[in-house]
């Protein structure tokens, strides 16, 4: 009887394990078949997916406990899992980067077939694979950048003095690892960008002597936190380096609980959500608001609009509409990302920094630069609507997003050399004329916030949390 019960238990366990993974298969990522992706699709998909990137110091792949062993647990959560067995750099760092990017392309291109939400695809890297994952998270184009990152005891710094020497040498090359410019470029704490770098979870052990957490994982966490991005840090008392999903790790169960809770805290946008891109300067970015990813105006706009919308912040501090300004917005990664986002609605709020004398000396070009942005977003508006044809135009399906053109909010103080008179007398009239010319909706934030000097921080320029809320309310009303 006991033997029967024992055998039944084993059978049930086997059935349970099998049920978690519905399908396993391998795909080639490179023409020579040396780069491959092992795919684990869950029985009951949640729509979420994770691309796994094993460690190994860029000299080998540790793809068992830092790869395949995670599949059962992830599939049990309904998460599709894809382990990328990337090619080693051998002096060419673009090889492993390209392999992981190709894995992301395949996952997102196959999303419908594999029951995946293409906007909910994360990356999970270990050690040197953590470094590679952080490179993908900070530097790769929007189309192949993850929606969230999980970094196990990651190599972050490429400075051999504070990191894993051989990871630095193998990734940058025997000469490259001595180049201060390359070291700085690929020490990925330097590449973190507000709003553009995805939320991250960093996992390490306090006694890791191979990849010191203070000069690696914590540096990435600090950069994320300082940028106002979502980030969590889990440091366990012991475990050294390389524990991964190994059951021998003393805190294995706690790790799974922590990771599971973190994953639940990262909301996934609906596939059919209306996409709203917030383009702008530091006022959009949320300068002066701690944790601006949560409390800046785009985040508050998301809260007002609800989960039927997907609002993304593409604000960059100090940027100008003017292409000859000191920091032109259209030179930024954020601008490329905003276009790649393929928004349904675009909120443009630029012009404040253009009012500075050093920038407004090129004010005669403000109109043409604003028109350039509008036409890039809406190619169908390359030719302004002619009188008498507005009704016919309105009946046609627009070849791009709805554009909301915001005037700058009032500059209550002349901080940062910003000139409110230039804003009111020169910039706003141009915006109004362009909006009328192209049939765009204009939101006059300057007029609507003229009496809100109590809703900005001490510099008199940037809205505080209350000011961001008012902006969000005004813009939400225009969107709805």
UniProtKB/Swiss-Prot annotation:
Catalytic activity: Deacetylation of xylans and xylo-oligosaccharides
InterPro entries registered for this protein in UniProt: AB_hydrolase_fold (IPR029058), AxeA1 (IPR050029), BD-FAE-like_dom (IPR049492), GDXG_lipolytic_enzyme (IPR050300), SGNH_hydro (IPR013830), SGNH_hydro_sf (IPR036514)
Signal peptide: 1-19
Pfam families reported for this sequence: BD-FAE, Lipase_GDSL_2
Source taxon at top rank: Bacteria
Activity relative to temperature: Optimum temperature is 30 to 35 degrees Celsius with glucose-pentaacetate as substrate. Active from 20 to 50 degrees Celsius. Still exhibits 40 to 70% of the maximum activity after 20 hours of incubation at 50 degrees Celsius.
EC code(s) of this entry: 3.1.1.72
Summary of pH dependence: Optimum pH is 6.0 with glucose-pentaacetate as substrate. Active from pH 5.0 to 8.0.
Key words, A-Z: Carbohydrate metabolism, Hydrolase, Polysaccharide degradation, Signal, Xylan degradation
Pathway where it operates: Glycan degradation; xylan degradation
GO biological process assignments: xylan catabolic process
Keyword check for 4Fe-4S: no
SUPFAM superfamilies given in the database record: alpha/beta-Hydrolases (SSF53474), SGNH hydrolase (SSF52266)
GO molecular function: acetylxylan esterase activity
Induction notes from the record: Constitutively expressed.
Free-text function comment from the UniProt entry: Involved in degradation of plant cell wall polysaccharides. Is an acetyl esterase with broad substrate specificity, releasing acetic acid from acetylated xylo-oligosaccharides and acetylated xylan as well as xylose-tetraacetate, 4-O-methylumbelliferyl acetate, glucose-pentaacetate, and cephalosporin C. Appears to have greater activity on oligosaccharides than on polymeric substrates. Is also able to release acetic acid from xylo-oligosaccharides with 4-O-methylglucuronic acid side groups proximally located to O-acetyl esters.
Family membership: Belongs to the AB hydrolase superfamily.
NCBIfam families noted in UniProt: AcxylEst_AxeA1
Protein name in UniProt: Acetylxylan esterase
Source organism of this protein record: Xylanibacter ruminicola (strain ATCC 19189 / DSM 19721 / CIP 105475 / JCM 8958 / 23)
Lineage, top ranks: Bacteria, Pseudomonadati, Bacteroidota, Bacteroidia, Bacteroidales
Name of the gene this protein is made from: axeA1
């Amino acid at each position: 009887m006991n033997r029967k019960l024992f055998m039944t238990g084993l059978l049930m366990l086997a059935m349970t394990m099998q049920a978690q993974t519905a399908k396993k298969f391998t795909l080639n990522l490179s023409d020579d078949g040396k780069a491959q992706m092992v795919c684990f699709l869950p029985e009951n998909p949640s729509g979420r997916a994770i691309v796994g990137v094993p460690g190994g110091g860029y000299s080998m792949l540790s793809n068992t406990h830092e790869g395949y062993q995670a599949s059962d647990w992830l599939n049990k959560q309904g998460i599709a899992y894809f382990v990328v067995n990337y090619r080693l750099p051998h002096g060419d760092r673009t090889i492993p980067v390209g392999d992981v990017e190709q894995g992301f392309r395949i996952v997102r291109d196959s999303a419908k077939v594999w029951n995946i939400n293409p906007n909910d695809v994360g990356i999970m890297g270990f050690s040197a694979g953590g470094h590679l994952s952080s490179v993908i998270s900070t530097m790769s184009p929007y189309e192949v950048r993850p929606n969230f990152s999980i970094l196990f005891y990651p190599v972050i710094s490429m400075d051999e003095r504070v990191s894993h020497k051989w990871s630095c040498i193998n990734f940058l090359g025997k000469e490259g690892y001595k180049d201060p410019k390359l070291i700085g470029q690929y020490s990925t704490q330097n590449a973190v960008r507000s709003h553009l770098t995805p939320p991250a979870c960093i996992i390490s052990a306090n006694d890791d002597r191979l990849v010191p957490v203070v000069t690696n994982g914590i540096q990435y966490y600090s950069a994320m936190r300082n940028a106002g991005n979502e980030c969590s840090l889990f440091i366990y008392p012991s475990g050294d380096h390389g524990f991964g999903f190994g059951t021998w790790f003393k805190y294995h169960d706690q790790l799974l609980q922590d990771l599971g809770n973190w994953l639940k805290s990262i909301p996934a946008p609906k596939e059919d959500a209306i996409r709203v891109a917030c383009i702008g300067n530091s006022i959009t970015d949320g300068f002066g608001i701690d944790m601006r990813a949560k409390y800046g105006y785009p985040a508050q706009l998301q809260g007002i609009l609800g989960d039927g919308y997907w609002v993304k912040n593409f604000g960059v501090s100090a940027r100008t509409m003017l292409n000859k300004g000191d920091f032109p917005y259209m030179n930024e990664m954020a601008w490329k990302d905003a276009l790649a986002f393929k928004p349904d609605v675009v909120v443009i709020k630029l012009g404040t920094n253009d009012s500075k004398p050093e920038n407004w000396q090129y004010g005669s070009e403000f109109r043409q630069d604003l028109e350039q942005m509008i036409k890039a977003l809406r190619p169908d508006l390359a030719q302004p609507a002619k009188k008498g044809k507005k009704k016919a135009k309105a009946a046609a399906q627009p070849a791009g997003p709805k554009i909301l053109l915001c005037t700058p909010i009032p500059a209550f103080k002349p901080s940062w050399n910003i000139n409110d008179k230039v804003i009111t007398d020169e910039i706003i009239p141009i915006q109004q004329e362009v909006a009328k010319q192209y049939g765009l909706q204009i939101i006059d934030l300057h007029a609507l916030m003229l009496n809100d000097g109590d809703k900005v921080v001490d510099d008199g320029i940037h809205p505080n949390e209350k000011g961001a809320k008012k902006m969000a309310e005004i813009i939400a009303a225009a969107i709805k």
